[in-house]
């Protein structure tokens, strides 16, 4: 068998902590890093996940010069690549096209942290995310064989409030109203991420759809609820996994009371994906519309590629309209809007309300009061009076069901 030299050389990197910025929080070593620990020269894959995940931006990726070439087998062909680059980089050197929107390339790898496993390939017979797994001498990589998908999921819990896609009447009840779990990995890099320990988690155990469905069904029995929600991170990134998970969950919960709730940013929910979700059993969905304007969207989400950001933003808005037009009775839809004066203006909030009203004045709209978190610890959580004002603005557009999350609990649809 001949050895092939792949194309453009991609030098390996190693992570290095900037001790002047580092606060010793341990997140990079204990949660984000998929190898031993950040900066461990022998095992560092140079993937950059720790750098993306550090709340203090204290990790730099340093290029390593004069890397040694090694041999790996890719789909039966022996190829030569630099050691300690990720499999994703090796695949890119061999002609694969990584992308962050489905169909823009042939290697969908949106999270870059090893959280979503959309890019997983067989490595020596074991499924591994190629974005954080380093090549090693003699490694056998199989990108062709179809296998049962896996994805890291955690945090099964009872939820007393629910999410954007939870009907507002249930939010008034006491006790748990649904059970939820959280997938790791996200295609956004929100500096104020409200759930960043899931978004940047690279160490959680990956589960098959059936394993996750069993745990969710057990959680339903534990908390004695009928609603089962999956959130994140961003739960829709690994499409094959999510569809199989919903099908497995529906098989294990065949009663009429069971509700299957998907909580999402909607950024890749094309019509064919939505159709597949409905067919798989989805009964409720909450879609977070981050903004109306592109500049606001990039500011909130950290997606700086404007072409990609435009696709994400338009896809989410289109998903809302598609569900309203095609499944007004079959699928309960809730729309989420973020609010913090440092992130989005009241004028844009009103324009979002106007646009949602033209789609459906009766759709449930839930405004989320973004609190200080992750890299935007300096922002202030909106005051109660601010959220009352937001409620009045949105209700004034003609929307009939506006709910606002506040430090004192939810307000609306009437106050």
Where are these regions (language model features)?
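Short, structured interface segments
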Residues: 44-64, 137-153
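Iron-sulfur cluster-binding cysteine motifs and their immediate structural context
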Residues: 14-17, 23-41, 49-65, 118-128, ...
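N-terminal [4Fe-4S]-dependent radical SAM core
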Residues: 4-14, 80, 84, 96, ...
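Glycine-rich phosphate/adenylate-binding loop and adjacent beta-alpha elements
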Residues: 51, 108-147
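Conserved AdoMet/S-adenosylmethionine-binding subsite of the radical SAM
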Residues: 210-377
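Eukaryote-biased recognition of intrinsically disordered, low-complexity regulatory segments
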Residues: 65-78
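Immediate flanking context of iron-sulfur cluster ligation sites
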Residues: 15-16, 42-44, 92-127, 176, ...
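A cross-taxonomic marker for long C-terminal extensions/tails that follow the last structured domain
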Residues: 384-415
């Amino acid at each position: 068998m001949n050895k092939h030299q792949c194309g453009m050389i991609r030098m390996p990197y190693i992570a290095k902590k900037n001790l002047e910025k580092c606060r010793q929080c341990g997140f990079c070593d204990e949660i984000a890093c998929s190898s031993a620990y950040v900066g461990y020269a022998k095992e560092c894959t140079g993937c950059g996940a720790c750098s993306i995940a550090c709340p203090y931006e204290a990790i730099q990726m340093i290029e390593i010069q004069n890397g040694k070439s090694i041999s790996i087998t890719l789909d039966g062909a022996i190829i030569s690549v630099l050691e300690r680059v990720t499999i994703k980089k090796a695949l890119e050197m061999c002609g694969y096209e990584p992308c962050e929107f489905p169909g823009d390339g042939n290697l969908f790898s949106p999270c870059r942290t090893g959280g979503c496993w959309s890019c997983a390939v067989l490595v020596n017979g074991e499924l591994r995310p190629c974005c954080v797994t380093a090549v090693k001498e003699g490694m056998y990589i199989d990108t062709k064989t179809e296998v049962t998908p896996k994805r890291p999921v955690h945090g099964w819990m009872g939820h007393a409030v629910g999410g954007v896609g939870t009907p507002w009447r249930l939010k008034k009840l006491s006790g748990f109203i649904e059970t939820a779990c959280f997938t790791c990995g996200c295609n956004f890099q929100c500096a104020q991420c409200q759930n960043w320990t899931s978004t940047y988690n690279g160490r959680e155990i990956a589960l098959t759809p059936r394993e996750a469905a069993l745990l969710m069904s057990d959680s339903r029995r534990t908390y004695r609820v009928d609603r089962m929600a999956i959130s994140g991170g961003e739960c829709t990134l690994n499409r094959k996994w999510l569809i199989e998970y919903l099908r497995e969950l529906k098989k294990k919960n065949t009663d009429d009371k069971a509700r299957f709730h998907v909580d999402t940013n909607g950024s890749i929910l094309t019509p064919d994906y939505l159709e597949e979700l409905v067919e798989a059993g989805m009964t409720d969905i909450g879609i977070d519309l981050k903004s109306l304007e592109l500049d606001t969207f990039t500011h909130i989400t950290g997606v700086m590629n404007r072409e990609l950001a435009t696709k994400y933003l338009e896809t989410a808005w289109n998903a809302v309209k598609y569900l309203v037009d095609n499944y007004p009775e079959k699928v309960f839809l809730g729309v989420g809007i973020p609010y913090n004066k440092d992130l989005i203006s009241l004028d844009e909030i009103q324009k979002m309300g106007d646009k949602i009203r033209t789609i459906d004045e009766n759709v449930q709209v839930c405004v989320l009061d973004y609190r200080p978190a992750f890299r935007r610890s300096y922002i202030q959580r909106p005051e109660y009076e601010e959220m009352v004002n937001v409620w009045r603005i949105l209700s004034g557009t003609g929307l009939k069901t506006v709910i606002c999350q506040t430090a004192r609990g939810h307000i609306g649809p009437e106050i």
